[in-house]
Amino acid sequence: EENIFKLQVFCYDLHMIRRDVVPVLKKLASQYPVVTITGPRQSGKTTLAKSLFTNKPYMSLEDPDTRRFALDDPRGFLSQFSHGAIFDEIQRAPDLVSYLQSMVDKSPEPGKFVLTGSHQFELMTQVSQSLAGRSAVLRLLPFTLAETHRLKGSKQHLNLSQQLLTGFYPRIHDRKLNPSQAL
């Protein structure tokens, strides 16, 4: 399997439930230079990207200093990542996507960049315009029922009404939060 998937089993097994989309994400990253993971906040995009692409530097564009650098000097910012990176919350620096296009055109290795973002419309507009044909898009939603069953263990399935009350967001299950107080 490609070197872009250096899965840290310890971290993956203890801190993250196996997501059903992992095989799809691996396949997309082996075919496209950019993979964009979209979905609602707290659905597990960052955890998935960081746990699957452990050999890539991670940059959160939520961080004000990182975002300022990316916005003020996009070429300088991207020059640090000639071998690729994970850019989390890419919608916070949407112009960066245009600069990524030229980098990917010069060096189109599969799985080079992983982008994550929560604002579907804004992000998809940028990606579809600047990275058309260069990026695969994966929509990550909160847990499926099957994923929550794996988390609970096969003997501890919640009934449907309990499951609906608890919800499907990973943080609730991961940290065993009270769902009525967590959201």
Region annotations inferred by a language model:
Residues E1-L183:
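Phosphate-binding site recognition
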